Amino acid sequence: GSRLIRTNCSFSKADEILVNRLEACINSASALAREVSNKRAVIAGRITCARADWGRDARFQFYGEQAVYLSDTWVDLIWLEQFSEYEELKLALRAVRQVSVIQTVAHLSLKKDRQSLEILDQLKELMSLGATFVGLMIDSEKSISRDQLQDLIDELGILSLILDFDLEKEAFSRISDSIH
């Protein structure tokens, strides 16, 4: 069975009406995850990027509200994911830290033009702001080299890596070898 179950309460524009029922959605997702895990998996409550057309204060409040709801449902982790803008991820992390002490994973979606030193500095800053674990979400095996990945692991100790692409056997073997 799964060792980690993430709840998913992100909404598309078509689901905007559900934002008003955010607390109920989060409570239901967390309860279902707890039930199916039978206390044998870590339950992570997922928070994704808020709508870009909302103001900064509204986005901060949105992240904080979700963190409160997730904290109330006793998730084991708060999982920040699908943030391609570093400043937005910092905003979300600050909102979470203001209302919750639950361990938090902060994932930065990697853009192809990023430099590894810049990424390393940003991930370190996220940890100094209260992220328990940091990670990258990559959409191509060419997004980060083996050496860059190893540098990040050496510096940070633990790095969560989400691969958002289909792996061919050969590509999987190369990535797997670079991690071990």
Annotate the PLM regions.
Residues 1-180:
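Domain-level signal for soluble alpha/beta catalytic cores
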